[in-house]
């Protein structure tokens, strides 16, 4: 067999391998791994979001709802917007007085 025919035979074999449209066992295994990886990531992401949402709800939303339900009836019984404003004004004054006392204690003590 001549050198040219060997090169042509080698060229055909390489073209057959590189331009093949059929998957090899390795390629099929690789595709399966990638699809499993995507599936696992999707499941893990969903679970992570659920955990985050649950934790956020338990630590933030539920306590605020409890406070709202505990005090909203009391405030609503007091009446209109004027009463609300008076209650808020009173609370702000209490906070201002408390801050002033804290500052006085820090500067004096």
UniProtKB/Swiss-Prot annotation:
Disulfide bonds: none annotated. Signal peptide: none annotated. It is found in: Endosome. Component of the biogenesis of lysosome-related organelles complex-1 (BLOC-1), a complex involved in endosomal cargo sorting. The gene is BLS1. Component of the biogenesis of lysosome-related organelles complex-1 (BLOC-1). GO terms for cellular component: endosome. Belongs to the BLOC1S1 family. It comes from the Eukaryota. Its main location: other. The lineage of its organism: Eukaryota, Fungi, Dikarya, Ascomycota, Saccharomycotina. This is Biogenesis of lysosome-related organelles complex 1 subunit BLS1. Keywords: Endosome, Transport.
